Amino acid sequence: MRNFKDKKADIELIYKTANNLNLPIHIFLPEGDIHKAQAVLVIHGGGWNDAIKDNSPWNGGWMGNNARYLAENGFIGIAVSYRSLMVSEELNVGDILLDCADAIRYIKEHLKFIDFGDIIYMGDSAGGYLVTVLGLSQNDELRPKAVVSLNPVLGLLDSKWKYGFNNCADIGKLTPKNIIGEKCARFLFMHGTNDSTVEIEYTEELNDMLRKTGHKSELVKIPDAQHAFILYDYKYPDEYVTDIMDRIITYINAELK
């Protein structure tokens, strides 16, 4: 067993090139038969900017440790990244979503040992927004079995986030509460009650809307937690983050196997 703080991936791939940037996928494998392992795809946050800006080696980003920890607990951990909006003024969040969709299509085409009928998407902050939209997709090719969305950015027109939607023809089509349809992944939201970066009220609203429309959704409030409580080497000690990760793994094993 490897130390989960080691973000060196077992498989490193480029899923596409856009704006002259090579966009990466890092895969962390568990011990044993990988064909029997459930996959969790993690998408990091960092606003709309803290992503791929150049072609320097990628170290797995904010959630590489989380992907490795999942692998150490029997899952296939998959970390993907996307274009930073700092690359071009012409880019917006719609392009980031396109990157994530292309990563999913690449994995489905090239990594046949991953069971997409059983896959889970997990994202933090801006990544929480991205996995939420993918979980609401009416496209069966993109929608996962379940989503774990951690303090997701949902107030898209708030001053902190609306820059990501410049040049968007219709922001309504990128707003989660506006795109709830007949098909929907199962959702687990987790949000800190002391989050001053992304307000919990937006998550409460979306969770309530999903439940009222008959979809399976649960919101776990983390008492006194600040933003990005799931990240190692950020605000909280390893033990705190690992406890949250273990709660997520317990949920997956109990509810999503």
Residue ranges and their predicted role:
Residues 33-35, 40-69:
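Short, surface-exposed "cap/lid" segments of acyl-processing enzymes
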